[in-house]
Amino acid sequence: MQTAYWVMVMVMVWITAPLSEGGKPNDVIRGLVPDDLTPQLILRSLISRRRSDKDVGKRMECYWKSCSRPLSRRHDLG
């Protein structure tokens, strides 16, 4: 438990140290995100993941001899 506490403290120091040197919060946050991570890349990843979900098809889920209907997504939520 003490290790988790010290890891949390060190992460907080790592994040807030640039702020004490005059850095802006936005610059500090941008420094934590990889350079190749863009909103377009995130959106493309989500779209491709959604397409692969549709290809799987519906299947029955059975646990301990009780089967449930396949879960269907609500398409009206957009």
UniProtKB/Swiss-Prot annotation:
D-tryptophan modifications at: W64
Signal peptide region: 1-22
GO cellular component, one term: extracellular region
Propeptide residue intervals: 23-59, 71-78
Residues the record lists as 4-hydroxyproline modifications: P70
4-carboxyglutamate modification, residue list: E61
Single GO molecular function: toxin activity
Subcellular location: Secreted
Keyword tags: Cleavage on pair of basic residues, D-amino acid, Disulfide bond, G-protein coupled receptor impairing toxin, Gamma-carboxyglutamic acid, Hydroxylation, Secreted, Signal, Toxin
Tissue expression pattern: Expressed by the venom duct.
SS bond list: C62-C67
Known role: Moderately activates human somatostatin receptors (SSTR) with a preferential activation of SSTR1 and SSTR4. In vivo, does not cause behavioral changes in mice within a few minutes of intracranial injection, but causes a progressive loss of movement thereafter. Four to five hours after injection, mice recover, even with the highest dose tested. Shows antinociception and antihyperalgesia activities in two mouse models of acute pain, most probably by acting outside the central nervous system.
Free-text comment on this protein's domains from its UniProt entry: The cysteine framework is C-C.
Family: Belongs to the conotoxin C superfamily. Consomatin family.
Comment field (misc): This peptide is an evolutionarily optimized stable analog of somatostatin. In addition, it adopts nearly identical conformations as in the somatostatin drug analog Octreotide. As this drug, it contains a D-Trp at the same position, whose synthesis is a common strategy used for enhancing the metabolic stability of compounds in drug design.
Protein name as catalogued: Consomatin Nc1
Organism annotation: Conus neocostatus
